[in-house]
């Protein structure tokens, strides 16, 4: 994947309120989002490019979420091993709007190491920014509520697959106890 053009970077820095596109503001952005000091060097490379794409997409395609809510929680990677894709962000925003209650993201972006640690499949959509696991109070508390939510979600444009502990979007029983009361949804 090629880095964003310098013209696009300048435009997106302005759109995101990050100031002029320069080394000082690149470093400021890195310090805001990258947890490890080793990733905070003021250099615009692949990691920073993925972060900028993620920041842009989160602002452009959602109104209810902050960029950090999607970060990989492993503490070893930058937190942004890829970026959330526009289709998935639009998808979860529609779900959030439909139910009208806050959505807690329980898992979104994952680096390969964290994905393996939590038992994710090798080709998990979390690795490419096309999946989110979430919990919504009063919407996903019981199996019946989660089934109802999945049946709504599967009718949305670009839906690929959803599941929870006890059910999936094909109407089959699923054993996924690690999911708790969360629902997984992914787009294609």
Where are these regions (language model features)?
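Surface-exposed patches in mature extracellular/periplasmic domains of secreted proteins
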Residues: 39-41, 101-109, 161-170
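A mature extracytoplasmic/lumenal domain signature
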Residues: 44, 107-109, 136-138
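Extended, low-complexity, intrinsically disordered C-terminal regulatory tails
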Residues: 90-119
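Active-site acidic/histidine clusters and adjacent loop/turn architecture
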Residues: 51-100
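Second-shell loop/turn segments in exported
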Residues: 12-18, 37-40, 74-85, 136-140, ...
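Structured segments of extracytoplasmic/periplasmic soluble domains
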Residues: 15, 28-36, 54-58, 94-98, ...
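Short acidic, glycine/serine/threonine-rich helix-capping segments at coil-helix boundaries
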Residues: 2-53
């Amino acid at each position: 994947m090629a880095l964003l053009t310098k013209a696009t970077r300048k435009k997106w820095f302005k759109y995101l309120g990050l100031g002029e596109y320069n080394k000082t503001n690149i470093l400021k952005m890195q310090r805001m989002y990258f947890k490890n000091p080793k990733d905070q060097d003021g250099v615009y490379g692949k990691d920073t490019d993925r972060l900028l794409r993620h920041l842009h997409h989160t602002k452009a395609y959602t109104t209810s979420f902050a960029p950090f809510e999607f970060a990989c929680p492993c503490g070893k990677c930058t937190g942004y091993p890829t970026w959330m894709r526009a289709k998935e962000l639009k998808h979860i925003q529609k779900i959030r709007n439909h139910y009208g209650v806050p959505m807690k993201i329980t898992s979104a972006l994952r680096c390969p190491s964290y994905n393996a640690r939590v038992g994710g499949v090798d080709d998990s959509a979390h690795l490419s920014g096309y999946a989110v696991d979430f919990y919504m109070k009063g919407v996903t508390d019981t199996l019946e509520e989660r089934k109802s939510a999945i049946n709504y979600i599967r009718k949305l444009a670009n839906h690929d697959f959803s599941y929870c502990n006890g059910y999936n979007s094909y109407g089959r029983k699923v054993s996924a106890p690690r999911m708790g009361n969360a629902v997984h949804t992914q787009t294609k």
